[in-house]
């Protein structure tokens, strides 16, 4: 996936085939024939043909809204983390302040359901009272800053990341937010499914306020106040598609201009409390949203804003309180919005919390035990091959002029590649894990994250810093550092198998590598130059040709019906779809080049070329609930797994040739209608 400052994190829906008992098959081709549905035709639905057997043999369990082989790998990683963490948690002699003490104690606190249930709402009572004690609206600005330090984000989000126009320097930035349902469409759309979710959200608000100690009448009043404020914020917010435009979301201003543009917002109080006393400039990502924040604070009665601030506290803390809070939180966010039927066991939630709060501490332990050096060496070779392949494809493009090709090749040559784990680890010595409440420890961990972040404000960007931990089963491209990153956890079977042949590895991890590289040249990435600056390096004619070709992709995915009456969003998913398309093209070309010196044979009746596409399709094998389809279609810039196969392959000529797809097959797309970019 592409990482931007706005969406801190290939998508969590990345999937691949799970481990199997056919050791001989894995050692030869990496393709498990049991994954296939040979009653299906490759040209009718290649997804069903390649993944139907896997889908049938892996029914969706109640704790998931979607589950694929990616999730299998994630579960494997979590089991490995549990082994590391539980060993430390069992020790009684961990040195105070040591990494072992922090990891072990936080896990034990998370697992202590007796203590959590005895405490109930007590861990948030003091903060609830502090909100109640706010005397006037001026104190709201100080409270917003204090709460953001603790990981609570009312009204908007503030963060520090590279300046898009001066990517070597970090800058303070703001981003729209403050919505309990996360996305503006849930407040504004009036289809039956959205209205039902909105009604259930109102019920959820009332129940949570009651759990926090309010009587029914006051909880109802609080719900109305929260909905009024959040609806106002939603109306001023940009759509998911609008948030993809880097120029529209770049609005840097000095402090004088900031105060002039938002005169009613007390920036001095906010930034001073945040620890940013000498701030010179800031990027207001979405000015209309920030203007509405200022108007809400200025015009909404203080009592209503107190309810809203308390809701943000309750919502942030709910997962770390007693079981009644956790259950109600699950009921709305997981059951209603995603279709999950059962909560994950406590140990899984505890491991995830430790992983999220002490990421690189756990990551260092993970790498030492589970990441072989040979995997990194093999990946370095694959990345070089893919980089060469993309360069050759750029040189051969008929639609692009030489001046733009030169710039594109310069950018490709300067890719910063990160594999496995960072060369230097974060220092968590200032973070204290104490024997008090679970929520108090989460707040301290959030405070540590906040301090780590604001220390970068106005400082040079550290290009050696990682935006994912090594134990994350994922990958990313970051445009402002022009880097591609492949954490250790994704570099294992079945994404990447040292014992499988090139057909499998190029079809799986090879396409992932090509996908991330292509992000540097998708509709967003192409707007950043080799140094990571938001700077136009295209000729006007080439930019127009790119946009025309990209529109073919938009139109094709817009036509896909993902559920009855619901279509994919071709604009929202454009960047990821271009990256899938480019990843397939680039990796297949590199694969064919590799076979010139190391030819492969037919295995299990499949040619090497066929196994390449089977490996790719198996990456996306999985189940997904109807509720999750609808949720992801609203907000996810990635296409659904099925359509990353059946939507991507009809535009790949080599796939047609590998499986003899003709105009008589339903997936066939005429050559003049196919996408052709990278």
Residue ranges and their predicted role:
Residues 20-22:
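Bacterial signal peptide processing site
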Residues 24, 38-44, 49-114:
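Active-site-surrounding "flap" and adjacent substrate/cofactor-binding loops of secreted or lumenal enzymes
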Residues 88-381, 385:
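Noncatalytic, helix-rich "gating/capping" subdomain that lines the substrate-entry/channel surface
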């Amino acid at each position: 996936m592409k990482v931007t400052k706005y969406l801190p994190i290939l998508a969590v829906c990345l999937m691949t085939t799970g481990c199997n008992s056919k050791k001989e098959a894995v050692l030869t081709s990496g393709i498990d024939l049991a994954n296939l549905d040979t009653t299906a035709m490759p040209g009718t639905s290649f997804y069903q043909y390649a993944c139907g057997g896997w889908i049938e043999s892996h029914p969706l369990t109640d704790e998931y809204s979607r589950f694929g082989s990616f999730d299998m790998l994630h579960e494997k990683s979590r089991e490995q983390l549990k082994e590391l963490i539980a060993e430390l948690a069992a020790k009684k002699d961990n040195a105070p302040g040591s990494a072992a003490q922090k990891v072990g104690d936080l896990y034990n606190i998370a697992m202590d359901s007796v203590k959590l249930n005895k405490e109930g709402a007590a861990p948030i009572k003091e903060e609830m009272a502090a909100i109640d004690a706010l005397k006037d609206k001026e104190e709201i600005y100080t409270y917003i800053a204090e709460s953001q330090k603790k990981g609570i984000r009312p009204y908007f989000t503030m963060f520090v990341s590279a300046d898009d126009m001066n990517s070597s320097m970090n800058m303070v930035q703001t981003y729209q937010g403050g919505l309990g349902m996360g996305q503006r469409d849930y407040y504004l759309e009036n289809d039956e499914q959205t209205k039902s979710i909105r009604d259930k959200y109102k019920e959820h608000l009332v129940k949570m306020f009651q759990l926090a100690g309010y009587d029914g009448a006051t909880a109802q009043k609080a719900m109305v106040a929260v909905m009024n404020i959040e609806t106002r914020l939603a109306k001023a917010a940009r759509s998911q598609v609008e948030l993809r435009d880097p120029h529209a979301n770049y609005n840097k201003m000095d402090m004088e201009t900031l105060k002039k543009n938002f005169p009613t917002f007390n920036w001095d109080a906010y930034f001073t409390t945040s620890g940013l006393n000498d701030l010179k400039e800031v990027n207001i990502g979405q000015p209309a949203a920030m203007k509405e924040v200022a108007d809400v604070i200025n015009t909404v009665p203080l009592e209503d804003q107190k309810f809203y601030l308390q809701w943000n506290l309750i919502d942030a803390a709910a997962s770390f309180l007693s079981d009644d809070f956790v259950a109600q939180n699950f009921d709305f966010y997981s059951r209603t919005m995603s279709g999950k039927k059962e909560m994950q066991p406590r140990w899984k939630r505890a491991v995830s919390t430790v992983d999220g709060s002490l990421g690189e501490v756990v990551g260092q332990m993970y790498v030492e035990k589970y990441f072989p050096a040979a995997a990194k060496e093999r990946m370095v070779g694959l990345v070089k091959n893919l980089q060469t392949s993309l360069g050759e494809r750029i040189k051969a493009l008929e639609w692009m002029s030489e001046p733009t090709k030169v710039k594109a090749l310069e950018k490709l040559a300067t890719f910063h590649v990160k594999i496995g784990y960072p060369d230097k680890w974060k220092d968590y010595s200032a973070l204290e894990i104490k024997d008090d409440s679970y929520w108090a420890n989460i707040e301290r961990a959030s405070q540590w994250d906040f301090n780590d972040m604001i220390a970068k404000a106005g400082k040079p960007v550290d290009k050696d810093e990682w935006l994912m931990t090594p134990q994350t089963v994922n990958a990313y491209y970051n445009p402002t550092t022009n880097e591609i990153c492949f954490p250790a956890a994704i570099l294992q079977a079945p994404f990447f198998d040292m014992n499988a042949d090139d057909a499998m590895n190029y079809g799986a991890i090879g396409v992932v590598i090509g996908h991330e590289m292509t992000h540097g040249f998708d509709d967003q990435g192409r707007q950043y130059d080799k140094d990571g600056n938001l700077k136009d390096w295209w000729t006007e004619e080439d930019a127009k040709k790119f946009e025309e070709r990209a529109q073919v992709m938009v139109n094709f995915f817009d036509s896909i019906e993902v559920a009855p009456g619901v279509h994919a969003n071709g604009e929202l998913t454009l960047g990821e779809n271009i990256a899938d398309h480019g990843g397939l093209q680039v990796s297949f070309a590199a694969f064919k080049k590799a076979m010139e010196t190391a030819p492969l044979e037919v295995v299990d009746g499949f040619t090497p070329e066929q196994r390449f596409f089977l490996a790719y399709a198996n990456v996306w094998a999985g189940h997904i609930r109807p509720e999750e389809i609808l949720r992801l279609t609203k907000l996810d810039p990635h296409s659904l797994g099925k359509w990353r196969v059946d939507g991507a392959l009809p535009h790949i000529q080599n796939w047609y040739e590998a499986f003899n797809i003709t105009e008589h097959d339903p997936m066939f797309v005429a050559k003049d209608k196919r996408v052709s970019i990278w």
